[in-house]
């Protein structure tokens, strides 16, 4: 107990920033969710709709950040399974990885989400043990090479629905659009906001 209190006090500034920003997000007044790594209401509705097209789906979110999307998916995926993947190497508040993971676990508490603390490449190796994956949502690294590797893996693995975030994002460091178009062809991609999925 004392150790937890000391950790909280040590990271108080970071935790306070995270809590106040999450409160801001929940208030519905945030205008720049992209800077915080979040989805707009339109995007969240689309992703949740995609995940409920069939009952009992196994859904994987790669790059969960704080688990808000995964938690929303778990609340809607009846009889299915939701796995959130993150290695906690980045967050918009600069929280240390240990604090970031702990904070995310608190957000996911009480939900059915399974949290895997691994990076995308490690997840793809371990995914063989999962059986069929009905839907994968990529929102981890946005670097062209990483996104292309994720998309190629999902295509080879026979993932039922391949989707992700930040398609069309003008950030020059992001290569999502280029990677997705190269692997699947622009004509085969459905876009809602900056969320994308390969058309069935």
Residue locations for each model-derived region?
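Class I SAM-dependent methyltransferase Rossmann-like catalytic core
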Residues: 3-55
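S-adenosylmethionine/decaboxylated-SAM
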Residues: 31-38, 44-200
């Amino acid at each position: 107990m004392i150790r937890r209190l000391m950790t909280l006090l040590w990271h108080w500034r970071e935790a306070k920033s995270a809590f106040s920003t999450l409160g801001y997000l929940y208030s519905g007044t945030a205008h720049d969710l992209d800077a915080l790594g979040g989805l707009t209401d339109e995007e969240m509705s689309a992703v949740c709709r995609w995940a409920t097209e069939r009952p009992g789906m196994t859904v994987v979110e790669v790059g969960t950040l704080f688990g808000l999307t995964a938690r929303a998916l778990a609340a809607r995926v009846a009889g299915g399974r939701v796995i959130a993947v993150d290695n906690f190497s980045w967050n918009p508040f600069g929280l240390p990885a240990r604090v970031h993971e702990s904070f995310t676990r608190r957000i996911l508490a009480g939900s059915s989400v399974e949290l895997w603390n691994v990076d995308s490449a490690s997840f793809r190796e371990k995914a063989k043990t999962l059986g069929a994956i009905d839907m994968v949502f990529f929102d981890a690294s946005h670097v062209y090479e990483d996104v292309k590797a994720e998309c190629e893996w999902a295509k080879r693995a026979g993932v039922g629905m391949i989707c992700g975030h930040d398609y069309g994002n003008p950030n020059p460091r992001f290569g999502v659009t280029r990677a997705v178009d190269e692997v699947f062809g622009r004509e085969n991609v459905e876009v809602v906001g900056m969320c994308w999925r390969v058309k069935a």
